[in-house]
């Protein structure tokens, strides 16, 4: 949903799903904002005049803080605003469109510069374009700044990690004869046009920046947080990602099995991932990372990293780094290293005509670099080393096995070790063991760290999309959330039809209901839209009950003087309106249903004097489709006489009106045979009665 103000009438009447809202001067801006937010159209247009613009501005402020984008636009921008999804930074007047119409121009857009130095352009019928962070400025004016952030990065990453599974599917096989990159890209673009843009992924790139900046302990970081981690590399923070495989954890046996992973060169991707893994590993030591790279060429990703890290390079080919030594690294250079990280990615160009001899030389070279790594770590400056290894029988430190995909899978992997690791017992590994690991395990996260334990102080903690994981006990997660005082945490919402459902997407997650928690009253429980509003953003995408929704738990977010500022009733009735105006026996079904359950006999004034609260009923009965409204917080504040709102339309509900609404929601679920909904209504009633 988006709300657009226009001083001039534009050519907008031909757009589907657009509603022209007439500002009612008889109502306050609160009432107008509420009526606007509950329109079922996705685009609401308001024609402005000097007589109403000040009141409209107040309504727009209220809508934006509730995560519903509302802004005055130029007439010549009506097209993109009505046809594109976007994330709006309403505090700074910046609009981030997530717009793929560049497909019309046969463009393929990436946000990592090193892709330009591959042969991708030879494999695709598209023009390959690079934009830093994927950001293309479309307009820069006094009213606002417009960017487009949509890219094809996700298609590249799916190709690298998931192409075998995707191209083995029946749908792909029916459409294409060949399993190649060109067809893969075409297929992924078809899926994008058929279903939806990856809105959450694109929007989160924008909105997670503020939550990251405010936090010092990050739980569950993954690669999508790389930009924020880089932007905050000089501030104090650590991460707990429960990620990383130790050498001693490897099992099984295998043999050499060369495989081409990609039609185009992804060696630079692998090197970039390796480098970031090392840098963020050192960052977790509470040190400012820096790096010496031995064997750096061509290093097409290094120039963009110089702004974040000091990077010293050694290679006989020229590399654009902070300081480049145009020669090979020698043993005499060991004592000259002053960076706290060293990345060794060297393999001499041995004669390939005699593979046995070459194999012997590769193993000897590997041992030599391992010894150099020990000497570097025994010195004063170096904290961690990431070095190239090969599958062989050898005794090595029990470090981390790092294996990001590269163009060809052969015999190589990487070993991450630090000062403490090399002091511990070494591990004997066999060639067979390492081949099995190389053939079956691929790294997919640059953040390596231990597991976070759900105890201790929570100040400064941000935990997005991870604490629901079944590695944590569900009751412990609830206890943790009830005392949580960090920036924000999330748990997966149960919008299935199975009580205590465990959802398996990328990981196994427990599911929760807002009624599971007993948080302080200044903590807001809301949806992604509500979370966006709290952190200064608004989003156009409507919530979908797709099994991948999270409850955002945000401490100290409540506006104690005005409940409506964040996670309020704005938009609460949209789903109800849609159902009543398209499916039910009468548009008054909501009023009639609640009064019938409440035992009201005279229905004459049911739409004006209902026995049950419509707000409370809608918040419970339709939570799957919009749980932005913090109903649990509202119930607690309301009953304790602590509820405050700056509104001329609010009327305090009686206990009977609230109780009747909860009972009506329970009956609604009962008639649907919905056990989860019944459980939710039952828990909500317990919360209310406990307050009584």
From Swiss-Prot:
InterPro entries registered for this protein in UniProt: VP3_Rotav
Superkingdom of the organism of origin: Viruses
UniProt-annotated stretches for the region N7-methyltransferase activity: 187-255, 433-558
Catalytic activity: a 5'-end diphospho-ribonucleoside in mRNA + GTP + H(+) = a 5'-end (5'-triphosphoguanosine)-ribonucleoside in mRNA + diphosphate; a 5'-end (5'-triphosphoguanosine)-ribonucleoside in mRNA + S-adenosyl-L-methionine = a 5'-end (N(7)-methyl 5'-triphosphoguanosine)-ribonucleoside in mRNA + S-adenosyl-L-homocysteine
Pfam family, any one: Rotavirus_VP3
Annotated EC: 2.7.7.50, 2.1.1.56
GO biological process per UniProt: viral process
Keywords linked to the UniProt accession: GTP-binding, Host-virus interaction, Methyltransferase, mRNA capping, mRNA processing, Multifunctional enzyme, Nucleotide-binding, Nucleotidyltransferase, RNA-binding, S-adenosyl-L-methionine, Transferase, Viral immunoevasion, Virion
Keyword Cell membrane: no
Subcellular location: Virion
Gene Ontology cellular component terms for the protein in this record: viral nucleocapsid
Gene Ontology molecular-function annotations: GTP binding; mRNA 5'-cap (guanine-N7-)-methyltransferase activity; mRNA guanylyltransferase activity; RNA binding
Chain positions covered by the region annotation 2'-O-methyltransferase activity: 256-432
Annotated region described as GTase/RTPase activity, given as residue ranges: 559-692
Family: Belongs to the rotavirus VP3 family.
Function: Multifunctional enzyme involved in mRNA capping. Catalyzes the formation of the 5' cap structure on the viral plus-strand transcripts. Specifically binds to GTP and displays guanylyltransferase and methyltransferase activities. Has affinity for ssRNA but not for dsRNA. Capping activity is non-specific and caps RNAs that initiate with either a G or an A residue. Together with VP1 polymerase, forms a VP1-VP3 complex positioned near the channels situated at each of the five-fold vertices of the core.
Quaternary organization: Interacts with VP1. Interacts with VP2.
Name recorded for this polypeptide: Protein VP3
UniProt source species: Rotavirus C (strain RVC/Pig/United States/Cowden/1980) (RV-C)
């Amino acid at each position: 949903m988006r709300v657009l103000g226009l001083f001039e009438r534009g050519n907008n009447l031909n757009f589907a799903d657009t509603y022209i809202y007439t500002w009612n001067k008889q109502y306050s801006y609160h009432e107008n904002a509420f009526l606007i937010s509950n329109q079922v159209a996705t685009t609401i247009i308001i024609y402005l005049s000097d007589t109403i613009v000040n009141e409209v501005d107040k309504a727009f402020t209220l809508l934006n803080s509730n995560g519903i984008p509302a802004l005055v636009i130029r007439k010549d921008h009506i097209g993109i605003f009505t046809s594109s999804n976007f994330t709006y930074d309403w505090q700074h007047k910046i609009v981030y469109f997530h717009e793929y119409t560049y497909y019309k121009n046969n463009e393929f857009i990436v946000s990592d510069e090193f892709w330009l130095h591959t042969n991708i352009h030879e494999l695709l019928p598209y023009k390959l374009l690079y934009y830093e962070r994927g950001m293309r400025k479309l307009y820069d004016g006094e009213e606002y700044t417009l960017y487009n952030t949509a890219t094809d990065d996700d298609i590249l990453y799916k190709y690298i990690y998931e192409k075998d599974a995707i191209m083995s599917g029946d749908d792909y096989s029916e459409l294409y004869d060949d399993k190649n990159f060109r067809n893969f890209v075409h297929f992924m673009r078809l899926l994008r046009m058929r279903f939806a843009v990856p809105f959450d992924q694109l929007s989160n790139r924008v909105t997670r920046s503020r939550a990251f900046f405010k936090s010092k302990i990050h739980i569950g970081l993954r690669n999508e947080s790389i930009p924020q981690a880089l932007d905050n590399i000089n501030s104090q923070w650590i991460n707990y990602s429960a990620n990383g495989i130790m050498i001693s954890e490897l099992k099984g046996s295998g043999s050499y099995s060369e495989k081409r992973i990609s039609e185009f060169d992804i060696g630079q991707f692998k090197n970039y991932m390796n480098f970031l893994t090392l840098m963020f590993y050192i960052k977790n030591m509470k040190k400012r990372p820096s790096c010496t790279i031995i064997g750096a060429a061509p290093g097409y990703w290094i120039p963009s990293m110089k702004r974040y890290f000091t990077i010293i390079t050694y290679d006989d080919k020229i590399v654009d780094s902070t300081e480049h030594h145009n020669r090979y690294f020698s043993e005499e250079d060991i004592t000259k290293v002053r960076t706290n990280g060293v990345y060794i990615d060297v393999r001499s160009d041995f004669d390939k005509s005699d593979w046995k001899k070459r194999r012997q030389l590769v193993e000897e070279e590997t041992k030599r670099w391992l010894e150099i790594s020990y000497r570097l770590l025994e010195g004063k400056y170096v904290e961690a080393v990431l070095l190239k290894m090969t599958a062989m029988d050898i005794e090595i430190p029990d470090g981390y096995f790092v294996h990001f995909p590269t163009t060809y899978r052969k015999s190589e992997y990487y070993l991450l070790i630090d000062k403490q690791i090399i002091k511990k017992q070494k591990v004997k590994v066999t060639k067979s063991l390492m081949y099995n690991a190389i053939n079956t395990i691929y790294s997919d996260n640059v953040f390596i760290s231990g597991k976070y334990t759900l105890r201790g102080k929570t100040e400064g903690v941000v935990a997005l999309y991870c604490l629901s994981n079944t590695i944590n006990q569900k009751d412990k997660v609830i206890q943790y959330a009830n005392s949580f005082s960090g920036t924000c945490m999330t748990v997966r919402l149960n919008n299935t039809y199975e009580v205590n459902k465990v959802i398996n997407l990328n990981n196994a997650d427990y599911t929760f209901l807002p009624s599971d928690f007993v948080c302080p009253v200044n903590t807001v429980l809301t949806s992604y839209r509500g979370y966006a509003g709290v952190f200064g953003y608004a989003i156009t995408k409507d919530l979908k009950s797709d099994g991948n929704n999270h409850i955002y738990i945000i401490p100290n977010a409540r506006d104690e003087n005005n409940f409506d500022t964040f996670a309020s009733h704005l938009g609460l009735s949209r789903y109800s309106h849609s159902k009543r105006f398209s499916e039910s026996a009468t548009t008054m079904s909501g009023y009639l249903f609640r009064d019938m359950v409440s035992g009201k006999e005279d229905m004459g004034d049911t739409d004006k004097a209902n026995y049950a609260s419509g707000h409370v009923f809608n918040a419970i009965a339709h939570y799957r489709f919009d749980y932005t409204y913090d109903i649990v917080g509202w119930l607690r504040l309301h009953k304790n006489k602590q509820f405050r709102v700056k509104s001329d339309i609010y009327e305090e509900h009686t206990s009977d009106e609230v109780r009747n609404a909860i009972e009506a929601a329970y009956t609604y679920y009962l008639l649907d045979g919905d056990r989860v909904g019944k459980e939710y209504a039952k828990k909500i009633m317990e919360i209310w009665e406990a307050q009584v």
